[in-house]
Structure formats: C-alpha cells, structure tokens
Amino acid sequence: MAHIPSGGAPAAGAAPMGPQYCVCKVELSVSGQNLLDRDVTSKSDPFCVLFTENNGRWIEYDRTETAINNLNPAFSKKFVLDYHFEEVQKLKFALFDQDKSSMRLDEHDFLGQFSCSLGTIVSSKKITRPLLLLNDKPAGKGLITIAAQELSDNRVITLSLAGRRLDKKDLFGKSDPFLEFYKPGDDGKWMLVHRTEVIKYTLDPVWKPFTVPLVSLCDGDMEKPIQVMCYDYDNDGGHDFIGEFQTSVSQMCEARDSVPLEFECINPKKQRKKKNYKNSGIIILRSCKINRDYSFLDYILGGCQLMFTVGIDFTASNGNPLDPSSLHYINPMGTNEYLSAIWAVGQIIQDYDSDKMFPALGFGAQLPPDWKVSHEFAINFNPTNPFCSGVDGIAQAYSACLPHIRFYGPTNFSPIVNHVARFAAQATQQRTATQYFILLIITDGVISDMEETRHAVVQASKLPMSIIIVGVGNADFAAMEFLDGDSRMLRSHTGEEAARDIVQFVPFREFRNAAKETLAKAVLAELPQQVVQYFKHKNLPPTNSEPA
C-alpha cells in the first residue's frame, strides 16, 4: 500500500496513513512452585533465566529479578519475545538460587529447568510443568508455570466526518477540502497519522469513513491530544489552510449516529485580525466506533486448535519404494522428500493441537486384501481410527505401510479434500472460533480429477480450512499453481468463485539444498492470515476476547 509522505500532496481518494502491519510480541510471565531449598539457614533466593536456541546452541536471552527467601516465587520481570508462527522457537527456562552478586551462572546453585517451544506455551496460554535436573530427573517437587499474553493493542477506530460552510478558497470555484490528523511525537512535534481523500468543489464535504489502528492515532492513550487540520487542495502542493481544532479519542467517543459532535474549524491568523471572526466552518464527527482487530495470536490464545491432516500420494509415478530413484525410497538417513515435507509442516503445527493426534491418509494405491484402488485410506489401515500420535506417529505409519500397498493411480485430490471438509463443516455448527483445519497434501504429479478438485476447493473455501500442497520430484506443477489463487481467485467448473484463497503450493525442489526451516516458513507463510480472514468474515471473535 502506497503512503503519502508528510507534506506531500494528497491525491483524491488518498490511502490512509499509518502502519498497516502488526509486529507481534508475546509477554511471558513465570512463577515457580515447591522449588528445591539450597540454602542451609533460610530458603532459596531464586531467579529465572530464559535461553533461546540459535543454531543448536542455547543463548541467554534475559533473566528475572531475584525473589528473596521464597520457594514459590512469582517473578514481576516479564520476558518479551517476537512471535513467529512459521518457526519452531525453542526456549529453555532455568532457575537458580542466587548465592553471590556474580552474573556468572556457574556461581549459583541450579534449581531445575524446563524446555519447550514458544508455540507450546502460546497454544495453551498457560502451562505448568515439572522442573528437571541436568540428568533429566525431577528437581524434587519443583514446578514452573509460564503464562503467555500478546503485547499489542488490537483496537481500531473508525471515524465518519463531514464539513459545513467551510471557507471558500478558490477564486473561481468553491474549495477542495481534505483533513489531516496529527498526534504529538516524542520530539514534541506534531506527527501526521492520517490524511483523508480530497472532496472536490464543495464547502460541505462528506468524507468516506476511515479506520486506523488506535495505537497509530493516539498510541492507545484515549486522552492524548489530536490535532485536526483542514486544507483546500491545490495541484501544485501549495494547499491553502482553512482551519484547525484539537480533540481526543475520549471526546470523539461521545459521537453517535444519532448525536454527532461538531467542532469549530479555527484559522488563528483570521481570528487575530478580525474582531467579528467566528470560525472557518464546522467539522462534524458523525460517528466514532472502536472495535478490536483480532490477530492470529488472539485466536490461538483464545483456544483455537489447528486440526492437522496429511494426505500422501501413493501413485505409480512415484516409483517402486525399494528403488533408490523412487520418491518414496527411504534413504540410509531414514528420510525422503515426503518425510521431509511432513516434518517441516508437522513440527510447527503439532504445537497448536492439544492431543497431537493427526489423521494420516493416502490416495492412489491398491489395498489388500482385494487390491482395490483407494483415494482416501488410513495409512495405519484403521479406517475407524486413522489418527497417528504426533509427527513421529505419522512418519512411523508411513514407513510401515509402504511394503503393504501397491502404487497405482490416478492422482485424485478431491476425495481427501472432501474428507477434511466434512469435519470442518461439522465444526462450524459450534459457531465459535475453536477449530481450524489444515490439510497437507504431498504429491509428485499432475492432478487427474482437476474439475472435481476445483469444485471441492471452492466449497472448502467457505469453511474453517486451508490446504497446503507440497510438490515433490521434478514434475510440471503448473496445475498446482492454478489452484493457488495468489494471482486470481479460483473458480469451479460451474463458474462459482472461491470465497477466499485457501491453497498454498510449494515445490519441494526449490528447498532441497536449503535449511529445513526455510520450507516451513514458505509453506506456512499464508496460514495465519487465512485463519484470521475466515473468523473475521464469520464475525467470530476469539472465545475469551474482551470487549473494545
């Protein structure tokens, strides 16, 4: 989105000013219970150290204050971290009994530690876990409790404004008025926050309602002064000043649809020169509404679970899994492109599902005992319970099923898309933002049932569901790009348009020589936005959300 620099000329219909993105920060609060008592004459004096993992090494990130003589501390110092959904952010919390004033940790008694990912904490909002010693044995009865909170003001303010009897500035016409909104900057100068569009040839303009983040308009401070300037637009950039007034968000909140607020637009020069000067027109605030613009993290902290399903392509084009040239051949390192894709996506998403039980389905193979082709079978051969325990369970079931099936065809996606869509449709009956379904399809080739798949994806776009397709091997994946509606919205063969873009396609070959984290980032890049987009469209707030 283009922004007009401060002092530049606003085009008619200019875009809103201010940041259009949210830097997501998470605050972690830590407390301990029943900590080991390392002091002889008194209780321990614990403090907590947070370590983050960087290239396999633990790096100290921050530490809390020391709680004197306390085996059940609640630390007031918080840990603040940037949150990245598409990464596994490993954390280690270590507690020590302070013995000296030294900053060196080896000079303090170790009380226990706990390691997990940031995603694990965020998905539960609050966790309590046993502390472990360096030999992984329990640190007595010691426990650690970690609570997560998003550090962002997600409120947005929507203003609807008009003008009445503004000063005429053009010699042969009326005025072309627009408004600018300013807030006080840290340097004491006024900082431009928003500029409205220009309304041509009128002294009684009605501007389009606009929405800006509350933190952009007033830093979240409802009493902070806001300066509003009214100008007559000139093509040469020398806009003529009409007048100004000051207000605050708390004052503007008094405006309602039935009771507008009116502000006199004052030109100080005219006010000083003319004794009978009244004003240079009236600015009318027709309505002021504050709402919450919920983020992906709001929904996760609100208890939304990500329901993960894997669909694996077992068609003959993959090659015999015993042949090293086959895409299903498991190399001496115990992996292949299918397993790499499962790990890359699954290790992120499994942190956001409390029971970590994931259905794993296959398609395009002949199954024993009658060797009929199936496009929707449980790879653990248990159709009533296709669930695998975590990503490890999916990998084990995948490896175990390979010798027992015959690769066949064709490459039909629609049965598995419809399978997950049925569960997503059931979840909508709850009318809450508690479940969102993610289908990972890993395939080596061209879709055989493109019309049926297009129809299935268009129908799924109305549900709490996203589809990630990872293409393995070196086939032509042009059809997959067609399903990924980044450039244009997908339509079914009947002409029905998808409600939103829910497909993300990534060719594995582009990541063969990259770090494994790179694939996860690319594959999951659009998912948070898709989750938020769906729940917003359905007007479903996070389950524990506060009113604005």
Swiss-Prot record:
Binds 3 Ca(2+) ions per C2 domain. Belongs to the copine family. One of its GO terms (molecular function) is calcium-dependent phospholipid binding. Expressed in the brain. Expressed in neutrophil precursors from the bone marrow and peripheral blood. One of its GO terms (cellular component) is nucleus. The C2 domain 2, but not the C2 domain 1, is necessary for calcium-mediated membrane association. The linker region is necessary for calcium-dependent cell membrane association. It is found in: Cytoplasm; Nucleus; Cell membrane. Residues 247-304 are annotated as: Linker region. Ca(2+) 2 binds at D39, D97, D99, D109. Residues 305-507 form the VWFA domain. This is Copine-2. Ca(2+) 4 binds at D170, D176, D232, D234. Ca(2+) 3 binds at D99, S102, D109. One of its GO terms (biological process) is cellular response to calcium ion. Its main location: cytoplasm. Keywords: Calcium, Cell membrane, Cytoplasm, Membrane, Metal-binding, Nucleus, Repeat. Residues 5-131, 138-263 form the C2 domain. The gene is CPNE2. Ca(2+) 1 binds at D39, D45, D97, D99. Calcium-dependent phospholipid-binding protein that plays a role in calcium-mediated intracellular processes. Exhibits calcium-dependent cell membrane binding properties. It comes from the Eukaryota. Ca(2+) 5 binds at D170, D232, D234, D240. Its cofactor is Ca(2+).
